[in-house]
Amino acid sequence: MVSSSGLIKTIAERLQHYKAENIVVDPVMVATSGSRLLEEDAVDTLKKELLPIATVITPNIPEAEILCGMEIHTEEDMVAAAKAIYEDLGCAVLLKGGHNINDANDLLYTKEEVSWFKGKRINNPNTHGTGCTLSSAIAANLAKGFDLKISVQR
């Protein structure tokens, strides 16, 4: 988790300096309990400095609600939110639906298409770190040369 504006700015500057490719950002902003983890200024810096240089961001529903300023209750809301985030930030959005939408269906929104990845919810109290694991796997697949949709699917 990147928790301060200064750290977010430094990371964005270094990624740009080194011309990093295949940047995958899991914008950790909300704890599993629902508590906000970032101050408002850090969220603003994240939205202005780091997320726009990402290839894809992987927010969960509470994080997407913060990024787009709308409530998400349905799959149609997920599409509208992902579109709003894409249009605001200019990067692909993998909106993870495991929080409060039917089952655990994820939505990939890109310039070219909208893709659904259907999943079944597994009730397990030990889910801490699953979003970070997913974003790391996507980054690894992109680094191997797979396109974004295949990287998410794998």
PLM segments and residue spans:
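Glycine/small-residue-rich loop that forms an oxyanion/phosphate-binding "nest" at active or ligand-binding sites
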Residues: 1-52
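Glycine-rich beta-alpha junction loops
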Residues: 29-31, 97-99, 121-123
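Short, small-residue alpha-helix embedded
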Residues: 66, 124-148, 152
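Glycine/charged-rich beta-loop-alpha catalytic/anionic-binding loops adjacent to active sites
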Residues: 111-123
